[in-house]
Amino acid sequence: PTDDPEINALRDRQVRNVLATLFFSQGIPMLLAGDELGRTQQGNNNSYCQDNEISWVDWDAAAKHSDLIEFVAALSALRRAHPVFRRRRFFSGQTGDSVDGQRDIIWLTPSGHEMNAGDWNSGYAKALAVCVNGDAITEPGPRGERITDSDFIILVNAHSEAVRFSVPASIGSPGTAWQVIVDTGSPQPVAGALDPAPASSAETGGAGLGSAGLGGSALNLEVAPRAIVVLRGAKPAG
């Protein structure tokens, strides 16, 4: 335990990073009771025999960690609202029968180049971007209907310094407007995640929350140290 505000702020951010990684991953998200309250078991990952404060859920912590509870609720709502995060089939990395002719998933380096084997095996790489295509969901809905969703870009920066990402204009449907809906490095990490937030320039520092850029030109965002930024693409009408 520590009273150092910088250390505690970093720990809180890392908690948000792990939760965001969980909720925006495919498969069933698994939470241990109390994760949404900041319950850590004091680092004990095998506490089955600890019938004491290590393993008990301290419900009084709910008031102290209300912001974390709200963050988890917002992530859960976003996941529930967007089937691209709940696919029942594996990604193929191919176009398949996507409406827009783009692949279902693309992995990029911060400079905007598609990742290759060397990038994946690099020992010093601490940042990447993943783009998931909402028009490339291959499984049908419960009535056999086609499932479509928004496109998403997830920027991950595990570095101790800020990293600038460049996403090529070819990502997403032509004319797509990108909105930052989650920024774990922000004091309000999900402001605007469910309701649009005021526009915020991506060229003047951190990612911010709100409108980040339009399709047709490269998207440039600076992601804070040890932070995750999620962008949702709004396709043009028609």
Which role does the model predict for each range below?
Residues T2, I7-R16, T21-G238:
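Carbohydrate-interacting/catalytic domains
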